[in-house]
Amino acid sequence: MYDVIVIGAGPAGLQAALTLGRMHRSALLLDSGEYRNGTVLHMHNVAANDGTPPADFRAIARAQLAEYADVEVRDARVERIDGEQGAFTLELADGGTVAARRIVLATGMADELPAISGLQELWGVGAFSCPFCDGHEHAGKPIAVIGEAARAAHLIGLLGRIVSSITVFPTEGSFAEEDRATLEALGAVVASSSPLSIAREGETVTLTTAEGEASVAGIFVASVVSRQRAPFAEQLGLAMLPSGAIEIDDFGRTSVAGVSAAGDIAHRASLPGAMAAVALAVAAGQLAAVGHIQSLMAEGA
């Protein structure tokens, strides 16, 4: 039986495994091979890794974990978690089972995009959601924002000082006159209708509407809906927040003893939502690991 099993090998899971390994706690890191930033070419706003390809970041982290005898890494998908603190059993997709005293969920969220032809193919390449991660790369260039008015206005406020111009498109239909006036007051050009399709050629992204085409350097989508990528919160009956995230305390502990959650799948109730950022995921992974280490030590394990 492992001290801790970490499910998910993005930044949060990798850091949790590293912290456990450094404290000589037996840990199993299970990597499904699915990552929220799996289509992203370069990650940004991460000290010492600004511009690093996420795949390189993960590869380096896994190579470093190999130096710790107490950490095992497997490419495996978990189907189900049963049990309680001190005796959790995980069923794997290959039919095997593994057991642990504690669990860290670091499975990440999945993005559900507006149903616009071509958008999914451009996600992380020509279409983005995070201005902190990808805004600077569009400095001095024209961009488009897609989304309902309130969220679009927030993005316009963040990106307006960075880019040369912003054209805002409704996700569907058209903006109400009051919303149009608000968006125009922020300096945006307001399109009359939603995009029918999106395509990219070279460095240019073209949005096609019923009225014609608009060409920009990139798109920021304000209407992304995020959901839990894995079913474990429901399986375990974890307390959830209105944002769709798992409720945690300062050390990532959930409502079920022995189960912690780290990364963008969880946040404290005092926050409106989880910020999807590599640096924050790393910090959350370390906190979750430390919480379990302290708990195990208190038990004399």
Model-derived segments and spans:
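Beta1-alpha1 glycine-rich phosphate/pyrophosphate-binding loop at the start
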Residues: Y2-A59, K141-P142, A150-G173
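Short, well-ordered coil/turn residues at beta-beta hairpins
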Residues: G8, A100, A106-G108, L113-A115, ...
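Glycine-rich nucleotide phosphate-binding loop and flanking beta-alpha elements
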Residues: G13, R80, D111, A152, ...
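Internal hydrophobic alpha-helix adjacent to the cofactor/substrate pocket in enzyme cavities
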Residues: A17, G21-R25, S165-E172, A279-A301
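Active-site glycine-rich loop that binds ribose-phosphate moieties when present
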Residues: V125-C133, A144-G157, A176-E177
